[in-house]
Amino acid sequence: MPVPEQKQTVQLSSPMNAVSSSEDIKPPLGLNGVMKVPAHRIGTLSLSLTKHICAICGDRSSGKHYGVYSCEGCKGFFKRTVRKDLTYTCRDNKDCMIDKRQRNRCQYCRYQKCLAMGMKREAVQEERQRAKERSEAEFGGCANEDMPVEKILEAELAVEPKTETYVEANLSPSANSPNDPVTNICQAADKQLFTLVEWAKRIPHFSDLPLDDQVILLRAGWNELLIASFSHRSIAVKDGILLATGLHVHRNSAHTAGVGAIFDRVLTELVSKMRDMQMDKTELGCLRAIVLFNPDSKGLSNPSEVEALRERVYASLEAYCKHKYPDQPGRFAKLLLRLPALRSIGLKCLEHLFFFKLIGDTPIDTFLMEMLEAPHQIT
């Protein structure tokens, strides 16, 4: 004889209390404990399971938030209240009904119900701390691991001139004078060519490229790389530049020697901009690495590989800016805007300063090849 099916009803109290219980609301069962629910009530009863409804307002729960199953609305309300340390007042008797329809009518009673149902203020603070730690981990990880800015900074510091005293360049009008600005700049560039190769070797992945490609990249970008360096070194100098040899060349001296126009461009488009934004050495190193990894350099065996390296520097620099200067969202773009000026000035400097004659009778490719094949000269 079949056992008659028993109908079970779910007892619910008042709307306020309906969402206040943390006990599971059992669905009706048929034979052998198997759920037997009319089709039209399946959706309603599945939502009545505690973990599927918001303990605060009865809306659909999106999961456990701050210790309590709740909807996104109540989760966000509680988080905002705690993070901004907000206080509310009730216009009635502090017993307002909080349900899906009326949850926004009284913030005081809604917040009190959040606390009564077990939401934890400390869980909000812990979430913020975890997010901060995750952000720091991402900065030091995903975007940065292929092209660590720490290594780029190390490269900058390793080749930094160790000059202790700086000498004011003589303002002699004679172009043949040993203290002529053009001669001084050329001599400084001559010296810096050696350290430039050492710097490039320390940039992540540069030494992994074919030797011929290394030579091509340095030959294509070395004038811009040197100009970027002495421009940044000159941030603290008024109306002049500071060379790696320790000489300070004043703009008056440059004008007397006939290179005033390009000198002024260096001061206004590079030095002053770097000074105004307080560009740090990590950012300088990244900009120089971007110049170094130029996929448009003629003769490269694999331009796409060089382009991929440049994109890694972009990503690392952007992550660094967001982490180090979170209050300056446009800083990364502002840094990149210095590159066109650097390129233009670099081309002009080649016309004025005859850089390709700096190393005497040795062809620059031979010189670079010998330097790249040699072990690190700077420790």
From Swiss-Prot:
The gene is rxrab. The lineage of its organism: Eukaryota, Metazoa, Chordata, Craniata, Vertebrata. Zn(2+) 1 binds at C54, C57, C71, C74. Residues 1-24 are annotated as: Disordered. This is Retinoic acid receptor RXR-alpha-B. Residues 364-375 are annotated as: AF-2. It is found in: Nucleus. One of its GO terms (molecular function) is retinoic acid-responsive element binding. All-trans-retinoate binds at R233, A244.
